[in-house]
């Protein structure tokens, strides 16, 4: 068996039995969690496919290791390799200190146009949680990754650039509500129809493919009408135009209320649910953040913009055990490019101590296996994590919050996971 590249066709990914997958080991605790994660992935693939499939890992450089070896934080060769091989796994990366140097994570997303930040959030039995019913949390967040206020179009207070922007807004556009123009920094919030449509399309298709019940469009369109309000409307339009008979939208519901009354609308939605149609609804962001605490079971797949998605993903992660067990992926569903990554930082004070929880990196690799269509291997890892946590053999972050837990190192936790792969 010889290793081959994953390729993309109009029908999706073409995954050989021995794909070559680049990995970025990461900074700080990156080496510790990668050693653990890669062993668990390899063991699950071996167990699931009896040696008929395996991954050939190919290291590429980014972050501190790249800078030390090449003088560049994100070498062009790394970008070209990921572009060529489509799929990659990465650990946490240090953001270089110094003006004008952007986050390496953001740079990777923008260079590869990874427009979806995918963040599934669910609870594993036994994981300590601050909420009463963490088992009600089972959501998949589709966060737009390339636009919004995170696009990085900012002008610092006091510069000639910001003065030009403010002068233009006031004198050319008639903006009179910049409260303190002499001392303001300015940020630009682009939200496009195309960017919205490709995100919402991916979210609805995911819901259909994975037997989910609804997609919630989360926005602050009541205040930001031409950006977040447009996101909501474009999302509804896309659902109606491209998924017609597979979805039932709240806008359809409102139309039926107007024409036939609320009872008829409730009946139509109930019928749609019985037929397995995806319910497309929306929620204002601040109300949504309350609902994920008070009644999280009402939401399933969530599609939202960049800033909202950042808040929502980490708020939900806190309800199920924190970002130490929160997986993430950055995906372009059109080109096939995807990077699967731990969602936490580099935690430099724990670097090399063999102490931290590798679950975020491992579960991100589960997302990768699912993305490749290797569901059997993915399920084996998920089942093993459930069994291991239920047996209270955990790393320090959980052990300190669980009665009767046995605290183990990063590598010992990986050993336990491998032992529990059935």
Curated annotation (Swiss-Prot):
Q: Which reaction does it catalyse?
A: D-threo-isocitrate + NADP(+) = 2-oxoglutarate + CO2 + NADPH
Which InterPro entries does its entry note? IsoCit/isopropylmalate_DH_CS (IPR019818), Isocitrate_DH_NADP_dimer_prok (IPR004439), IsoPropMal-DH-like_dom (IPR024084)
Query: Which is a Pfam family this sequence falls into?
Result: Iso_dh
Marked site positions, Critical for catalysis: 150, 220
- Which Gene Ontology terms describe the biological processes this protein takes part in? glyoxylate cycle; tricarboxylic acid cycle
Q: Which residues are listed for Mg(2+) binding in this entry?
A: 310
Cystines in this chain: none
Q: Which SMART domains match?
A: Iso_dh
UniProt: D-threo-isocitrate binding residues: 103, 105, 109, 119, 143
Needed co-factor(s): Mg(2+); Mn(2+)
Q: Give an example GO molecular function.
A: isocitrate dehydrogenase (NADP+) activity
Q: What EC number(s) does the entry state?
A: 1.1.1.42
Keywords on this record? Glyoxylate bypass, Magnesium, Manganese, Metal-binding, NADP, Oxidoreductase, Tricarboxylic acid cycle
- How cofactor binds (record note)? Binds 1 Mg(2+) or Mn(2+) ion per subunit.
Query: What residues does NADP(+) bind to?
Result: 94, 344-350, 357, 396, 400
Task: Indicate the family of this protein.
Answer: Belongs to the isocitrate and isopropylmalate dehydrogenases family.
Question: What is annotated about its quaternary structure and interactions?
Answer: Homodimer.
Q: What does this protein do?
A: Catalyzes the oxidative decarboxylation of isocitrate to 2-oxoglutarate and carbon dioxide with the concomitant reduction of NADP(+).
PANTHER family according to UniProt? ISOCITRATE DEHYDROGENASE [NADP] (PTHR43504:SF1)
NCBIfam families the record matches? PRK07006.1, prok_nadp_idh
Protein name according to UniProt: Isocitrate dehydrogenase [NADP]
The primary gene name is icd
């Amino acid at each position: 068996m010889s290793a081959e590249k994953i390729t993309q066709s109009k029908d999706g990914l073409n995954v050989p039995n021995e794909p070559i997958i680049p990995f970025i080991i990461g900074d700080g605790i990156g080496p510790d969690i990668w050693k653990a994660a890669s062993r668990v992935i390899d063991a699950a693939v071996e167990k699931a496919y009896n040696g008929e499939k395996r991954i050939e890992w190919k290291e590429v450089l980014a972050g501190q290791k790249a800078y030390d070896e090449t003088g560049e934080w994100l070498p062009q060769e790394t970008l070209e390799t990921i572009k060529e091989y489509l799929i990659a796994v990465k650990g946490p990366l240090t953001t270089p200190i110094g003006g004008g140097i952007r986050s390496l994570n953001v740079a990777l997303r923008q260079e590869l146009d990874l427009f979806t930040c995918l963040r599934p959030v669910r609870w594993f039995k036994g994981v300590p949680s601050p909420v009463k019913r963490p088992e009600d949390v089972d959501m998949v967040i589709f966060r737009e990754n390339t636009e919004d206020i995170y696009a990085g179009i900012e002008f610092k207070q006091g510069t000639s650039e910001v003065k030009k922007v403010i002068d233009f807004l006031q004198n050319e556009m008639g903006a009179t509500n910049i409260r303190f123009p002499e001392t303001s920094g300015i940020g630009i919030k682009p939200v496009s129809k195309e960017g919205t449509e490709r995100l919402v399309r991916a979210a609805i298709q995911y819901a259909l493919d994975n037997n989910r019940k609804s997609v919630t469009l989360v926005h602050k369109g009541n205040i930001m009408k031409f950006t977040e309000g447009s996101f909501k409307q474009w999302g509804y339009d896309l659902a109606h135009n491209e998924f017609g008979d597979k979805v039932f939208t709240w806008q359809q519901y409102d139309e039926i209320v107007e024409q036939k009354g609320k009872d008829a609308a409730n009946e139509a939605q109930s019928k749609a649910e019985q037929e397995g149609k995806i319910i497309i609804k929306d929620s204002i962001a601040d109300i949504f953040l309350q609902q994920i605490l008070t009644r999280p079971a009402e939401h399933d797949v969530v599609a939202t913009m960049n800033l909202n998605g950042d808040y929502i993903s980490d708020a939900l992660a806190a309800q199920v055990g924190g970002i130490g067990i929160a997986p993430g992926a950055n995906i372009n569903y059109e080109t096939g490019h995807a990077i699967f990554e731990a969602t936490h930082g580099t935690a430099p004070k724990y670097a090399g101590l063999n102490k931290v929880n590798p679950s975020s990196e491992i579960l991100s690799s589960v997302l990768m296996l699912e993305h490749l269509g290797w569901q059997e291997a993915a399920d084996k890892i998920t089942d093993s994590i459930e069994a291991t946590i239920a047996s209270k053999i955990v790393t320090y972050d959980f052990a300190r919050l669980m009665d009767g837990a046995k605290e183990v190192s990063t590598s010992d936790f990986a050993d336990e996971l491998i032992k529990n792969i059935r």
